[in-house]
């Protein structure tokens, strides 16, 4: 009887420890497993089809649908505050006009965000700090346009306890990354972006594998006629995960969201099955998630 109670006690503790693990910790365990067989989903600027891009609602929607990472863009205001905004100007995505760097945060907070159809909504421009607090423990964030002022970004990460939530990416050489970003390489995830259509793509990958051993590479190529695409996927297998973007047709040999709407096996399926892709950034996260569940890849 005591043995039975003991076994049930251990089982209870095990279940409790799994439940206590945050969603971010679960995602990180997959990111750091080069043999991971599930596919991680990245929502480009959040769920922008159903909420304004780079808004807290777009991020919340992505969390609720089960997305793993949201890609967001960071800009700096006149008074040095970091906000979410893709463009250097306010015109396209807000009710304001002019350059972000010429507006102070309090003034930007009086504006409303526009949706994908350029219609005014109730949503405000979020600060990076507000975003980090919404994401905390629930989803990871890929910060775009934040490289040049990452010292300030990192202060907010430490303040909010979200340093382990962040993915940074860039197309610089390994030497440049070590020189410019070196003090953060053991604190946040850094992924190289490699354009496979460029002459020294393979050497760049080899350099990063040798010196930094990144958890993943973001790869780009225009056409399946590129002879090294499959070679690179084979090289990275068991070493680093492969990330492709399906936002438009020139980013992944035409195997994009549009192709996937017509034939998902030729779009997403090709990237996953033929190129061993384990991270996909998409403008259609709900559609991709449904496909992955159907394929038992979630």
Regions found by a protein language model. Name each.
Residues 1-24:
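Bacterial Sec-dependent N-terminal signal peptides
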Residues 20-298:
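Phosphate-group recognition and catalysis centered on beta-loop-alpha active-site segments
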């Amino acid at each position: 009887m005591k043995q039975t109670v003991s076994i049930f006690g251990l089982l209870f503790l095990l279940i409790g420890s799994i439940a206590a693990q945050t969603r971010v910790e679960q995602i990180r365990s997959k990111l750091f497993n080069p043999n991971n067989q599930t596919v991680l989903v990245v929502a480009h600027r959040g769920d922008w089809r159903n909420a304004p891009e780079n808004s807290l609602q777009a991020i919340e929607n992505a969390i609720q649908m089960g997305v793993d990472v949201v890609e967001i863009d960071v800009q700096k205001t006149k008074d040095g505050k970091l906000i979410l905004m893709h463009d250097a100007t306010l015109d396209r995505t807000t009710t304001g006009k002019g350059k972000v760097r010429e507006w102070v945060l309090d003034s930007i907070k009086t504006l409303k965000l526009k949706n994908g159809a350029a219609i005014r909504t109730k949503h405000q421009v979020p600060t990076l700090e507000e975003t980090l607090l919404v994401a905390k423990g629930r989803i990871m964030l890929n910060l775009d346009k934040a490289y040049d002022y990452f010292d300030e970004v990192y202060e907010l990460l430490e303040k909010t306890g979200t340093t382990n939530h962040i993915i940074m990416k860039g197309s610089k050489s390994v030497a440049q990354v070590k020189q410019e970003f070196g003090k953060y390489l053991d604190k946040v995830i850094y992924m190289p972006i490699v354009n496979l259509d460029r002459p020294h793509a393979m050497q760049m990958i080899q350099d990063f594998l040798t010196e930094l051993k990144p958890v993943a590479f973001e790869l780009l190529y225009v056409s399946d006629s590129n002879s090294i695409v499959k070679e690179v996927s084979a090289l990275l297998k068991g070493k680093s995960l492969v990330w492709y973007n399906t936002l438009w047709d020139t980013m992944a040999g035409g195997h994009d969201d549009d192709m996937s709407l017509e034939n998902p096996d030729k779009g997403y399926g090709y990237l996953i099955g033929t190129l061993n892709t384990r991270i996909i950034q998409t403008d259609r996260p709900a559609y991709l998630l449904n496909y992955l569940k159907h394929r038992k890849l979630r």
